[in-house]
Amino acid sequence: MVKSIWVAGGCFWGIQKYFDSIKGVRHTIVGYSQGNVINPSYEQVCTQTTNHTETVQVDYDDRFVSLTSILEHLYQIIDPFSLNKQGEDIGNQYRSGIYYVDHEDALIIKNFLLQKQNQTSKKIMIEVHKLHNFNIAEEYHQKYLDKNPNGYCHVNLSLSKKRFN
């Protein structure tokens, strides 16, 4: 069955490119979530006054990739201990988060992060919330690194080759 989860971890260009290469991911789209302005522009989000985060909607076939596997992938490509910063990107729109619509997904996410937290003394700064809203970003942001192969990317894309059960 195809399911959706929304993930954030810095600039959405690299996150989208990374998840597009994961077996079982059927579709991704970048946008702005969790904010207090309807259909914000990129420029509005960059003012850090709308409370949106750059987010990637990941549609995946759970027969081929599990939610836990997707969470492992996200965890390996971001700094989970950083607040409002990933790579060179600084600001609340670059915070790390996992957003869900299904209650059973919430339990999986919370258990996953609890396990990770128990393995470290550092505080994990990934927010977990029910998806409040998701506004699709402008077309020029969609598949940005496919259109601009030399574009900025804070994500180590070669890590997508690693498999998680």
Swiss-Prot record:
Pfam families: PMSR. Keywords: Oxidoreductase. The active site is at residue 11. It catalyses: L-methionyl-[protein] + [thioredoxin]-disulfide + H2O = L-methionyl-(S)-S-oxide-[protein] + [thioredoxin]-dithiol; [thioredoxin]-disulfide + L-methionine + H2O = L-methionine (S)-S-oxide + [thioredoxin]-dithiol. GO terms for molecular function: L-methionine-(S)-S-oxide reductase activity; peptide-methionine (S)-S-oxide reductase activity. One of its GO terms (cellular component) is cytoplasm. GO terms for biological process: cellular response to oxidative stress; protein modification process. Has an important function as a repair enzyme for proteins that have been inactivated by oxidation. Catalyzes the reversible oxidation-reduction of methionine sulfoxide in proteins to methionine. PANTHER family: MITOCHONDRIAL PEPTIDE METHIONINE SULFOXIDE REDUCTASE. This is Peptide methionine sulfoxide reductase MsrA. The gene is msrA.
